[in-house]
A protein has these predicted regions:
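Mid-chain, well-packed structural core segment of small domains
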Residues: 71-73, 83
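Intrinsically disordered or compositionally simple regulatory linkers and C-terminal tails
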Residues: 1-15, 121-130
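Long, amphipathic alpha-helical coiled-coil segments characteristic
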Residues: 18-66, 73, 97-120
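Eukaryotic all-alpha helical interaction scaffolds
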Residues: 71, 89-90
Length: 131
């Protein structure tokens, strides 16, 4: 998978890790605000992933719901979909699918945070340039 497949301008059907166009719209092109939102997402995603470790259904559902909003805010569509799936699994009481849904959210979050980390190290780069 190329960097352009993973990162950058993605549509909802073929999303990148972060939808650069969506992020730019959400921040009105303000690179400082963009950086701040990305930093908040990285910190918040770590906290959220810690909350889902205990397998308390109410905490997992609340954490997944929070992650959905955070991910949508920056255009991290894969993370949002993984969090939606986790929330659905918890709401349905499907304990057999819980571990798989948690693993999918962790994987999508790690992928997004890696791309964001590369962007934060070199702010002149767009996420589509980060591999």
């Amino acid at each position: 998978m190329s960097a352009s497949d993973l990162l950058g301008s993605g549509s909802d059907s073929q999303p990148g890790v972060i939808d650069e166009a969506h992020l730019t719209r959400m921040t009105l092109g303000d690179r400082g605000l963009e950086r701040e939102l990305l930093q908040i997402f990285v910190g918040q995603s770590a906290t959220i992933l810690d909350r889902i470790t205990g397998h308390d259904p109410a905490a997992i559902a609340a954490a997944a719901h929070t992650m959905i909003g955070s991910a949508r805010g920056i255009g991290a569509w894969r993370v949002a979909r993984a969090a939606e799936q986790l929330e659905r699994v918890v709401d349905e009481g499907n304990e057999n699918a819980l571990d798989e849904a948690i693993a999918a959210l962790k994987s999508a979050s790690q992928e997004a945070n890696t791309a964001i980390g590369a962007r934060l190290v070199d702010p002149s780069r767009h996420i589509s340039d980060c591999a």
